[in-house]
Regions:
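Helix-loop boundary and gating motifs at the non-cytosolic
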Residues: 1-22
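Loop-to-transmembrane helix entry/capping segments in MFS-fold secondary transporters
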Residues: 16-17, 100-112
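Helix-to-loop junctions at the C-terminal end of transmembrane segments
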Residues: 32-46, 131-132
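Structural signature of the two symmetry-related core transmembrane helices
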Residues: 48-63
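Helix-loop junctions at membrane interfaces in 12-TM secondary transporters
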Residues: 65-77
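Intracellular juxtamembrane helix-capping segments at the cytosolic ends
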Residues: 87-100
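A membrane-interface helix-boundary motif in multi-pass transporters
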Residues: 129-147
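Multi-pass alpha-helical transporter architecture, strongest
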Residues: 142-169
Length: 169
């Protein structure tokens, strides 16, 4: 997403001002999520929230792929960044905090950053390879489906992530 979204919008004849504005919408949505995430974290299990983040990411990428020429649709898709990155990142930090000792939390964050970076790199390489063959819309729609495979991973999260944070000891 990060590697190709601006180019994708440029191909759809968005101005650089509109592209910059849409990126700002995503950042603002993320900041709002950081401010209010406690409402989600205190009410819902981390397993359910990870599932929600994956589903919202799929919706975001599907909207981006299906409505490439619609500023309103892209605006709406960018607000989902609150879930596709903001809430997911907070959940990852919470999992690191709970599963790594104080002295090992830096390593936990390094592991998370490495896995995130490898995912971005691998996804960017694949998207770049297939972009000219299939076009941006198909790439975003395909990514929308692929991200749902992450839901299979969620069932293997440890049982300690099945309760809201407020319910844990």
């Amino acid at each position: 997403f990060y590697s190709f979204y601006s180019n994708y919008l440029k191909e759809a004849d968005f101005t650089t001002t509109e592209i910059g504005f849409l990126w700002a919408v995503g950042v603002i949505a993320e900041i709002i999520m950081f401010a209010y995430a406690h409402l989600f974290l205190s009410r819902y299990s981390l397993k359910n929230l990870v599932s929600l983040c994956l589903i919202m990411t799929s919706i975001r990428w599907m909207v981006a792929g299906l409505f490439s020429n619609s500023f309103i649709a892209q605006f709406a898709a960018q607000t989902i960044h609150a879930f596709s990155f903001g809430l997911f990142h907070l959940i990852a930090m919470r999992m690191i905090f709970q599963n790594f000792s104080a002295g090992q939390q830096g390593r936990g964050q390094a592991l998370y950053s490495t896995m995130w970076g490898l995912g971005v790199a691998f996804g960017s390489i694949l998207a770049g390879h297939y972009w000219k063959i299939y076009g941006g819309s198909i790439i975003f729609i395909s990514a929308s489906g692929i991200v749902l495979l992450g839901l299979l991973w969620v069932k293997w999260l440890p049982s300690q992530f099945e309760q809201p944070i407020s319910m844990r000891n």
